[in-house]
Regions:
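Charged structural interfaces that engage phosphate-rich ligands
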Residues: 1-444
Length: 444
C-alpha cells in the first residue's frame, strides 16, 4: 500500500519541527477564541503516527483499510478544533445520517408518487477519505462556513487554513521510515468524518439530488449512499451517472426487489401500499456472532446492557413483528451457544417488546448544556458494594462549603474499563519481537 507513490511519498528528513513551527506561526492569525488557541498551543504533541492497515475480509478479493492513528501528532489539536466547530454544520444537510434509526425513520415516511417501479439504489464512494483533494476541500469548507456561519467571530479564511494545515501535513511512520500522505484525509485524524461529510454534502446540495424528479429518499452515511428512486431503469441509471462528488468514484448497486444498507435489508414486495418497502435485520455472511461469553468477567449489567441494546436495534430495524421474532430467535440461539443461561435470557428478553417500536423510533432531545461527572476506574467486584449516590452526596456537601461551580451538581456516572491482561502484555511483547526480527532480516 505504501508503494503507491501517488498517495504516499517517502521522506528522508524529519519534518516534525518544521511543521510545529508552522503551526505556532499560523495559530495567532486564525483569531480563534482564547480557550481554543490555548488548547492548540499547550496540548500539541509531536509523536508521528504509526501506520498500519486493517484487512477488509468481507471483500473479494481482500483489500486493506489504511489506518493513521493521529492522536498525538502536530495536527491533532487543530483537527479536534475543526471537528468541534464543524459538527453543527451537519444539521444543514439533513440527508447525512448517523445511525440506522435515522434511516428507518426516513423510510417510514416515504410514499410513492405513481405507478412506476421503485428502485433501491445503494452507492459506495471508493476510498473516500484518501481521495479527497486538500486544496479544493479546504476552499469548500471555507465556503460552507461563510454561508452558514456568517455571524461567527471565526472567519471562513481561518477554517480554510486550518483544514489545509491538517490535510497538507499528514505524515506517518512505518518501520522507521517516514512517509507523507500527499492526498486526502488521514483515516485516524479527528476531523476526518465531518470534513469528508461536508465535502460530499456541498456537491450533493449543488446537484439538488434530494429534489430531483423521482427521488423518494436520499441519505448518506459517510461513504455509503441509499436512494429510493421511482422511475424507469434508464432514469435510475441516469441519476447514478450524473451524481458526482468531485473527483471521487461511486460504485452503484440497484434492485427492484432487495438491497442492503448498513445493517438494514430492504425488501420491495407487491401490494404493500402505502408502505414503500419492508425492512429487516441484515447480517454479513462472515458474521460469527462472537458476543461477550457468559464466562467473561464483565459485570452482569454490562452483559444485560448489550443484550437489551441489540433487541432494541432489532425492533427499530424490523418493519414487522415476524421479522423481529426471527432476529430475536437467532440472537437467542447465538447467546445460548456463548454460554448464557436460558432463564437469564428469558428475563432480559421480556424487557424489550415489539409493541414499543413507535416509541423507540422517537429521538429524545439531549440537553447538551449538561455534562455528567465521570468516575473512571476498572472493572472490579468491589463496585458491587459501593453506593455511588452516597459517594456523590457526601462529596457535594464539601463542594457547597467551598462554593464550587454548579456543574458539579450533574449526576455521577461510573466509567469503567478492563485492566491490562496477560494477553495484552503478550501481544505487545510479540509485536516487539516480530518487528525486531523483521528489522534484523532487512539489515542483513
Amino acid at each position: 500500500m505504501l508503494a503507491d507513490t501517488v498517495t504516499y511519498k517517502p521522506v528522508f528528513v524529519d519534518p516534525t519541527q518544521a511543521i510545529y513551527d508552522t503551526l505556532i506561526d499560523q495559530v495567532a492569525s486564525w483569531r480563534l477564541p482564547p480557550a481554543m488557541e490555548r488548547y492548540i498551543l499547550r496540548k500539541t504533541k509531536t509523536i508521528k503516527p504509526q501506520f498500519h492497515a486493517i484487512p477488509k475480509v468481507h471483500k473479494d478479493p481482500w483489500t486493506l483499510r489504511p489506518i493513521v492513528p493521529s492522536h498525538s501528532w502536530v495536527t491533532t489539536t487543530t483537527s479536534e478544533v475543526i471537528d468541534y466547530l464543524c459538527q453543527p454544520l451537519l444539521k444543514q444537510f439533513p440527508w447525512i445520517v448517523n445511525s440506522s434509526k435515522e434511516v428507518i425513520n426516513q423510510i417510514e415516511k416515504v410514499r410513492t408518487l405513481g405507478t412506476e417501479p421503485i428502485w433501491i439504489l445503494t452507492g459506495d464512494v471508493t476510498a473516500f477519505y484518501t481521495n479527497i483533494p486538500p486544496k479544493p476541500c479546504s476552499k469548500m469548507l471555507g465556503k460552507i462556513w461563510e454561508v452558514f456561519c456568517k455571524e461567527s467571530s471565526i472567519s471562513s479564511r481561518a477554517i480554510k487554513q486550518m483544514v489545509r494545515f491538517v490535510m497538507d501535513n499528514n505524515f506517518l511512520e512505518y518501520r522507521g521510515q517516514t512517509f507523507h500522505q500527499m492526498n486526502g484525509l488521514a483515516i485516524g485524524t479527528a476531523c476526518a468524518p465531518v470534513v469528508a461529510n461536508l465535502y460530499a454534502a456541498w456537491y450533493e446540495r449543488k446537484a439538488r439530488v434530494c429534489h430531483q424528479n423521482g427521488v423518494l429518499m436520499y441519505v448518506r452515511y459517510i461513504d455509503d449512499i441509499l436512494c429510493l428512486f421511482q422511475g424507469t431503469a434508464l432514469d435510475a441509471k441516469a441519476l447514478c451517472e450524473n451524481l458526482k462528488i468531485g473527483p471521487l468514484r461511486i460504485s452503484w448497486s440497484h434492485s427492484l426487489e432487495r438491497n442492503e444498507f448498513l445493517d438494514i435489508e430492504m425488501l420491495r414486495m407487491p401490494n404493500i401500499s402505502p408502505r414503500v418497502l419492508h425492512t429487516r435485520l441484515f447480517r454479513k455472511p462472515m458474521n460469527r456472532h462472537l458476543y461477550i461469553p457468559w464466562s467473561s468477567a464483565h459485570p452482569s449489567h454490562v452483559k444485560k446492557g448489550f443484550v437489551k441494546a441489540e433487541l432494541i436495534r432489532f425492533a427499530i430495524i424490523c418493519s414487522t413483528y415476524e421479522y423481529f421474532a426471527d432476529a430475536r430467535k437467532e440472537f437467542y440461539g447465538n447467546l445460548r451457544r456463548r454460554g448464557y443461561p436460558a432463564q437469564t435470557l428469558e428475563e432480559w428478553f421480556k424487557q424489550v417488546t415489539y409493541d414499543n417500536r413507535q416509541a423507540l423510533l422517537v429521538f429524545r432531545k439531549k440537553d447538551e448544556s449538561k455534562v455528567p461527572l465521570m468516575l473512571s476506574g476498572h472493572y472490579n467486584p468491589v463496585w458491587d458494594y459501593v453506593d455511588v449516590k452516597k459517594v456523590i452526596t457526601e462529596a457535594r456537601r464539601f463542594w457547597v462549603k467551598e462554593e464550587l461551580p454548579n456543574a458539579l451538581q450533574e449526576p455521577l456516572i461510573r466509567s469503567l474499563g478492563r485492566t491490562k491482561s496477560l494477553f495484552d502484555l503478550m501481544s505487545t511483547w510479540n509485536k516487539t519481537v516480530l518487528l525486531s526480527i523483521s528489522d534484523i532480516a532487512e539489515e542483513g
